[in-house]
A protein has these predicted regions:
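Formylglycine-dependent sulfatase
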Residues: 1-175
Length: 175
C-alpha cells in the first residue's frame, strides 16, 4: 500500500480468485476466462516503445513492467505509474498521471484488468470498442480526467459484483 501513487481506487476487485489468473488478466486487459496471451508490454513494443523490466535509465518512449517493485524502485521512475495488488478481493490500485491524476481517491467500481486499456489510451493508442486493439478492461482515462463512471458490473467465474451489490459463490450482499 505504501507504493500507491496518484489517484487511489478504493473499489478495486481482482479478476480471479487465483493469483495466476489475476496476473494474466491484468497483463492482457482481458478476463482470465479468455486465456488471452498478448500482454500489454507486447502491445507497447509493437508500436515502437522500449519495454523494460527495470528502473535503469531509458529513452523517451519506454514502457516499464515492474512486478512487485519496492517503493524505493518506484521513486526512481518518472511518468505515468500504475500500481495494483493481485492478492484477493478488494485490492489496492492507483494511477499516477502527472498533470492529470496526481492525488485523491476514487470510489468507482474498477479492476486491475482496466490498467492495460488505460495505459494504452494514455499513450495515444486506439482503445475504443471494436478497435483493432481490444480489451475487456475499461479505459479509465474518462474516470481520471472527468469523473466518469467505472464499471456497472464486474463478472467473475464465481459471480458478479456491482457498485451496490454482489452475488459471489451463491451469496448475495446486501441480502
Amino acid at each position: 500500500e505504501t507504493a500507491l501513487r496518484g489517484v487511489r481506487f478504493n473499489n478495486t476487485w481482482v479478476p480471479s480468485e487465483t493469483y495466476a489468473d489475476s496476473r494474466r488478466g491484468t497483463l492482457t486487459g482481458q478476463y482470465p476466462q479468455r486465456q488471452a496471451t498478448t500482454r500489454i508490454s507486447e502491445v507497447f513494443a509493437g508500436v515502437g516503445y522500449e519495454v523494460r523490466e527495470d528502473t535503469q535509465p531509458a529513452g523517451e518512449d519506454v514502457f516499464r513492467l515492474l512486478e512487485q517493485p519496492s517503493p524505493e524502485e518506484l521513486d526512481q521512475v518518472e511518468g505515468v505509474i500504475a500500481v495494483c495488488s493481485l492478492l484477493g478481493g478488494n485490492a489496492p490500485m492507483s494511477v499516477l498521471w502527472p498533470g492529470v491524476a496526481e492525488n485523491g481517491e476514487n470510489n468507482e467500481l474498477v479492476s486491475p484488468i482496466d490498467l492495460a486499456p488505460t495505459l494504452a489510451a494514455i499513450a495515444g493508442l486506439d482503445v475504443r470498442p471494436n478497435a483493432r486493439l481490444s480489451f475487456d478492461g475499461l479505459n479509465l482515462v474518462p474516470v481520471l480526467r472527468h469523473g466518469a463512471s467505472g464499471h456497472a458490473a464486474l463478472f467473475f467465474d464465481n459471480g458478479v459484483r456491482m457498485i451496490d451489490a454482489a452475488l459471489i459463490d451463491d451469496t448475495a450482499t446486501p441480502p
